[in-house]
């Protein structure tokens, strides 16, 4: 655990008692504060009270008297589309609002670091798609070479639940826009921006606010090194804002769509399955990504570029990084090949919760029986047009399956449930084809999470193959 600094003797309110909220409450208590907790869910309050925390309704008059700060869980709206009443009450009372990420960055460094031979590093990864894979791949690379590494944030453990970093240790964080938007301190040693596509627009009042939330990771003087995906205009702009000129190698530009100029400082790009690194005009490394089983498709090649670049900032050699990549097993629910039978492959990409990530998943396979649908996100399905050339047929799930199906430019069958979609896709699939779950939508109309949706897909496929 990382005890929170500077809160001894204070009363600090905590809103939201899920994983990050309870983690923050524990770390505040470890730092000498009294955590005053609230969650609208009685079961969540009961869990907190069982750990000895005080729960108190925070919208009542005077609720913030004597409270020094409010710590908010990432799933709770703090501004758009409308502030949560507790957050608004705190702001009216003049109480600072923060989250566990802000607490982490102000508390992780200790006086013990002065005695270390090599100060620990914090690498933070943000972006619309590929964050989890980039973080998991980088963590795997570090473990493969024997570096002490912990991953946390939007993946793995809560940031305050990790062990205090050791001499030479590395903490790899996945940070969502919800987390970067609210954190009062964001000071990583290396910051990574993978890409930007429309997502969570209701929480950020549009693309401008969404980009601004991501961009905050690179403010406050900026990280020592920045790895920036430049395949979208926002990333290209961000790299330009951070760079002092063509020879500035504090910024590493990465791409999975284009060959980057070797003269532009430090670049890493993937073309036709080959990763190339150029530094100050000379090639410094290359990897053939095509036969790495844990990284299928061009979208994973972008993730490979990001993890490779971050690893290089730590001084790891290209050949060592390549050896580690070849043993990377991949993440569940992200281009996860779950079975192959009678020449048909079954792939679970339930994490493809928006149209951009679904389009990238579709580009990685041929002859696709596509299971899609769910809670459609703002922006519609327009971006999928042109990405479905290899789709033989779509099998649409979700409460609004009929409306979803009407927007597709391929033959589509309304199935509604996962069981029906899997049954129909398996019945019609033949050798050389792939049954792919890539929903292009959120899961919350039918499932608690994308993980539950992916697990349902796996269970349906497995039951039929074993039946």
From Swiss-Prot:
It is found in: Cytoplasm. It is an enzyme of class 6 (ligase). Pathway: Cell wall biogenesis; peptidoglycan biosynthesis. InterPro entries: Mur-like_cat_sf, Mur_ligase_C, Mur_ligase_C_dom_sf, Mur_ligase_cen, MurD. It catalyses: UDP-N-acetyl-alpha-D-muramoyl-L-alanine + D-glutamate + ATP = UDP-N-acetyl-alpha-D-muramoyl-L-alanyl-D-glutamate + ADP + phosphate + H(+). One of its GO terms (molecular function) is UDP-N-acetylmuramoylalanine-D-glutamate ligase activity. ATP binds at residues 127-133. The keyword Cell division applies. Cell wall formation. Catalyzes the addition of glutamate to the nucleotide precursor UDP-N-acetylmuramoyl-L-alanine (UMA). This is UDP-N-acetylmuramoylalanine--D-glutamate ligase. It comes from Ruegeria sp. (strain TM1040).
């Amino acid at each position: 655990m990382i005890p929170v600094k500077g809160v001894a003797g204070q009363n600090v309110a905590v809103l939201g008692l899920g994983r990050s909220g309870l983690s923050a409450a524990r770390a505040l208590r470890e730092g000498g504060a009294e955590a005053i907790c609230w969650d609208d869910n009685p079961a969540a309050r009961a869990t907190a009270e069982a750990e000895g925390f005080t729960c108190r309704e925070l919208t009542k008059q005077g609720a913030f008297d004597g409270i020094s700060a409010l710590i908010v869980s990432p799933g709770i709206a703090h501004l758009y589309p409308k502030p949560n009443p507790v957050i608004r009450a705190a702001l009216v009372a003049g109480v600072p609002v923060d989250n566990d990420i802000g607490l982490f960055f102000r508390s992780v460094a200790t006086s013990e670091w002065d005695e270390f031979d090599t100060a620990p590093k914090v690498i933070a990864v943000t972006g619309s798609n590929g964050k989890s894979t980039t973080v998991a791949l980088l963590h795997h690379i570090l473990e493969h070479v024997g570096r002490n590494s912990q991953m946390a944030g939007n993946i793995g453990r809560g940031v305050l639940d990790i062990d205090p970093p050791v001499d030479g240790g590395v903490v790899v964080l996945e940070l969502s826009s919800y987390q970067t938007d609210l954190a009062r301190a964001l000071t990583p040693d290396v910051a990574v921006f993978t890409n930007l596509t429309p997502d969570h627009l209701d929480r950020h009042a549009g693309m401008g606010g969404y980009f601004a939330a991501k961009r905050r990771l690179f403010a406050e003087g900026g990280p020592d090194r920045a790895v920036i995906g430049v395949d979208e205009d926002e990333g290209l702009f961000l790299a330009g804002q951070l760079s002092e000129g063509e020879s500035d190698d504090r910024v590493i530009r990465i791409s999975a769509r284009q060959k980057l100029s070797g003269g532009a400082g430090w670049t890493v790009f993937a073309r036709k399955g080959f990763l190339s690194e150029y530094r100050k005009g000379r090639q410094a490394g290359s990897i053939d990504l095509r036969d790495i089983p844990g990284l299928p498709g061009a979208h994973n090649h972008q993730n490979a570029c990001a993890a490779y670049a971050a690893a290089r900032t730590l001084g790891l050699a290209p050949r060592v990084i390549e050896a580690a990549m070849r043993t990377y097993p991949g993440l569940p629910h992200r281009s996860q090949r779950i079975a192959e039978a009678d020449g048909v492959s079954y792939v679970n990409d339930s994490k493809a919760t928006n149209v951009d990530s679904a389009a990238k998943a579709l580009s990685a396979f041929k002859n696709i029986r596509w299971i899609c649908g769910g809670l459609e996100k703002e922006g519609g399905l327009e971006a999928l047009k042109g990405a479905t050339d290899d789709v033989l047929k779509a099998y649409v799930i979700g409460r609004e399956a009929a409306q979803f199906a009407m927007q597709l430019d391929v033959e589509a069958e309304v199935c509604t449930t996962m069981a029906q979609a899997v049954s129909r896709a398996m019945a019609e699939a033949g050798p050389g084809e792939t049954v792919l779950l890539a929903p292009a939508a959120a899961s919350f109309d039918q499932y608690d999470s994308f993980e539950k949706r992916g697990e349902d897909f796996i269970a349906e496929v497995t039951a039929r193959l074993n039946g």
